[in-house]
Amino acid sequence: MDGCGTYLDTMRREAPLVQCITNFVAMNVVANVLLAAGASPAMVHDAEESGEFAAIAQALTINMGTPSPRWVEGMEAAARGATAAGRPWVLDPVAVGATAFRRGLGARLLALKPTVIRGNASEILALAGAETRGKGADSADPVAAAEAAAQRLAESSGAVVAVTGPVDFVTDGRRGIRCANGHPLMPRVTALGCSLTGIVGAFAAIRPPFEATAAALAFFGLAGEEAAKTATGPGSFQVAFLDALHALSPEALDRGARLEAA
């Protein structure tokens, strides 16, 4: 896929407002990642306003990391509000296969028609109803093992599905693309997966979801590669990663994106 830099340039010029219903662990990191990339985060999650706010925002992201009954009400209200207003929304089904509570929540959110679903291989397998070896929020399954399930899930839900790992896979049920950008230090920092969901939301706000998701993955992964050039470990990597998101130019993204048709 060509032209990732154009997607980045448009996202930065429009600075979309992204409503993020994410978890306690990730909230600060996600907000800083979106700001560094050029978007505008809003951490609005309470059911009293989440649905109304979803109609104002340009995109919504819902992360299942630390659900509670009240937060679930906010998630469902926001998803309904985004869908009614024609806003794209991204589902991050964190540890969806771990408990009956999470499986039920994942099924209800899936029924509310997300635009994009982004998860690791075990999460996508579980959401698709397939066997998985996941352990909590971590994946014990390789991306390749979830590609067929991702295609089925995309076909049945109408969503673009992104399976993220060392080499990411994105599908809309008809087309597929792989992204090889990224660095081994990225999984050593908490909330980067949650932050990637936020970036996918920012790109989906201004581009068709399949292309937007692929461009977002390339941008995020390439920023990780750039950050690793100066980092000495996970601590310094966090700071360097924010700087790389801010500094990465559309031209550099065009040169460095490693995307190929699947």
UniProtKB/Swiss-Prot annotation:
Cofactor names: Mg(2+)
One Pfam family it belongs to: HK
Binding site for substrate: 43, 191
InterPro entries in UniProt: Hyethyz_kinase, Ribokinase-like
GO terms under biological process: thiamine biosynthetic process; thiamine diphosphate biosynthetic process
Pathways involved: Cofactor biosynthesis; thiamine diphosphate biosynthesis; 4-methyl-5-(2-phosphoethyl)-thiazole from 5-(2-hydroxyethyl)-4-methylthiazole: step 1/1
Keywords: ATP-binding, Kinase, Magnesium, Metal-binding, Nucleotide-binding, Thiamine biosynthesis, Transferase
Chemical reaction(s) catalysed: 5-(2-hydroxyethyl)-4-methylthiazole + ATP = 4-methyl-5-(2-phosphooxyethyl)-thiazole + ADP + H(+)
EC number from the UniProt entry: 2.7.1.50
GO molecular function, one term: magnesium ion binding
Functional note: Catalyzes the phosphorylation of the hydroxyl group of 4-methyl-5-beta-hydroxyethylthiazole (THZ).
Protein name stated in the entry: Hydroxyethylthiazole kinase
Originating gene: thiM
